Amino acid sequence: MVQFAIARDFQGMPFYFNVTTPVGRGYPNAAPEDVALVQFIFVVGTRGQHALDPALLPTWSKVTVTSRSDDATLAAINAWQAFRRQKFGGSVDTDGIISVVRTESGMYGPGKGMSYDIVHLNFVLLFATKSIWPRIDKDSRCPPVLAAAVRKALSGHLAP
């Protein structure tokens, strides 16, 4: 089940979609909605108007939204984490897992910390679906399982 989470200190993004189960290596039975969210971000990220780093395109473009962890999804997660580590340094986890955010700040680590992968991926989602965000359920590529989870997460927060 995808969760609605308030974003603190993330300029331009008032909230984000959080996963409720870890997605990636070692989690073959992650919640289908959570896997679909991560896969959907990879799919729309390759076709969004915001320029995705070219190093990510070959791996991300192989992902399809199946709602199940598969080799293409795991490879895309690994590529994303390697990209973030190269860009932001050794404080970025490269464990092959999109973790559940369990902090109010959306950050982990000492000091100012580092944003969780899912928070950073939500920026990709925001830019790639800017004309409809946060109603990503209205995107034709959004599978029914994710669309239902998004509507449930947003109910009570937004007008239809």
Where are these regions (language model features)?
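Cell-envelope/ECM-targeting effectors and their regulatory/trafficking segments
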Residues: M1-P160
